[in-house]
A protein has these predicted regions:
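Extracellular, repeat-based ectodomains that mediate carbohydrate processing or recognition
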Residues: 1-203
Length: 203
């Protein structure tokens, strides 16, 4: 803000012009991942976390949605919310398996409504609440997630209808007259080999 870096509580960290870029060690830690050594090209680092979305609520408090790698066929979605005094970091959904071989941490992704961070949209190939497989293809779900919610208390609504196609990479698009949840639908083999359409639903 105004050329400065701050922690979530407003504590000044440094000035970009005078002090240079922010180092990871200077930033505020929200989640501690694993510290294990390199394993293989087919596995991700232990408990590696990937940020997918960051937005602010009406009070200006940040909310961070991210994925957490546990295994190639077991990833989770988490949401960290600042309440003005502390972070509330919790698991909110099963993210399912990796999208394809050699990219162990690639998920269908999680996103937040830019006007309401409690409105969460995800893509997963398992039941978001139980982790039971859906049949191989990723589907898109949405839910309202309160600060005290976790995987067991959230009610997910499925949005995508096609069981035979991948439904991935959702985003919430807000406009003056219309608001739309969009995602990519089709065949996704790798990040350079895909045949996808952009589809969406108004809400």
């Amino acid at each position: 803000r105004n050329g400065n870096f701050y922690r979530a509580d407003g504590t000044f960290i440094k000035n970009l012009k005078n002090d240079g870029p922010l180092k990871p060690s200077e930033a505020e830690k929200v989640f501690q991942g694993g510290n294990g050594p390199f394993r293989t090209l087919d596995l991700s680092a232990e408990q590696s976390a990937w940020t997918s979305a960051i937005t602010f609520d009406s009070q200006g408090f940040p909310h961070i949605a991210y994925s957490l790698y546990l295994a190639n066929d077991d990833q989770r979605y988490r949401l960290a919310s600042w309440d003005g005094a502390q972070w509330h970091d919790r698991e909110i959904a099963y993210a399912g398996s990796r999208l394809y071989d050699r990219e162990a941490s690639y998920t269908g992704l999680i996103t937040l409504d830019p006007q309401n961070p409690q409105h969460v949209v995800i893509s997963t190939d398992v039941d978001p609440s139980s982790g039971v497989p859906l049949g191989g293809k990723h589907q898109v779900f949405r839910a309202t997630v309160d600060q005290q919610d976790d995987t067991g208390s959230i009610v997910w609504q499925r949005l995508s209808k096609d069981d035979n196609q991948h439904n991935i990479r959702p985003m919430v698009v807000r406009g003056d007259k219309h608001s739309v949840i969009m995602w990519l639908q089709g065949q996704y083999n790798t990040y350079t080999d895909y045949d996808l359409d952009a589809v969406g639903l108004s809400f």
